[in-house]
Amino acid sequence: MRPTQTMLGGGGGAPIGKHNHYLGGWGNFGGMKQRGIISYGISPNRQNPLAGTAHDAVFNTFRRVSSQFLYWAPSLVAGYYIMNWAIERNHYLNSKAGRAEFAGQEE
């Protein structure tokens, strides 16, 4: 595994291959003051990362399910009716009437 540029430079020297514009090592930036860079921040105790999560979860879930409804609903209904038919057929074949009807067909 090859060491990174920071490790080759020892973490404090000039990066290898960059001789023109160097601000300094880690924690020791010693260059000209930069201008025109604006950054905005908000205090961590003023943030609300879960704002609207429950509301969005309900309505986003409804939107996504309703848009996919025609893809999964027909197979769900078909599966329900096939299972219902199979259960009823099994009950009939294991009943007294079903055994009497198919008694001579066993192999």
Swiss-Prot record:
GO CC terms, sorted: mitochondrial inner membrane; respiratory chain complex III
InterPro entries xref list: Cyt_bc1_su8, Cyt_bc1_su8_sf
Primary location class: mitochondrion
Protein's GO biological process: mitochondrial electron transport, ubiquinol to cytochrome c
Membrane-spanning intervals of the chain: 63-93
Membrane topology, record value: Single-pass membrane protein
Residue positions assigned to the propeptide: 1-8
Compartments in which it is found: Mitochondrion inner membrane
Coiled coil stretches, renumbered: none
Residue intervals annotated with topology Mitochondrial matrix: 1-62
Keywords: Electron transport, Membrane, Mitochondrion, Mitochondrion inner membrane, Respiratory chain, Transmembrane, Transmembrane helix, Transport
Mitochondrial intermembrane side, ranges: 94-107
Domain of life from the UniProt record: Eukaryota
UniProt-listed Gene3D superfamilies: Cytochrome b-c1 complex subunit 8
Function: Component of the ubiquinol-cytochrome c oxidoreductase, a multisubunit transmembrane complex that is part of the mitochondrial electron transport chain which drives oxidative phosphorylation.
PANTHER family: CYTOCHROME B-C1 COMPLEX SUBUNIT 8, UBIQUINOL-CYTOCHROME C REDUCTASE COMPLEX UBIQUINONE-BINDING PROTEIN QP-C
Entry similarity comment: Belongs to the UQCRQ/QCR8 family.
Subunit note: Component of the ubiquinol-cytochrome c oxidoreductase (cytochrome b-c1 complex, complex III, CIII), a multisubunit enzyme composed of 10 subunits. The complex is composed of 3 respiratory subunits cytochrome b (cob), cytochrome c1 (cyt-1) and Rieske protein (fes-1), 2 core protein subunits pep and ucr-1, and 5 low-molecular weight protein subunits qcr6, qcr7, qcr8, qcr9 and probably NCU16844/qcr10.
Name of the protein this chain belongs to: Cytochrome b-c1 complex subunit 8
Species of origin: Neurospora crassa (strain ATCC 24698 / 74-OR23-1A / CBS 708.71 / DSM 1257 / FGSC 987)
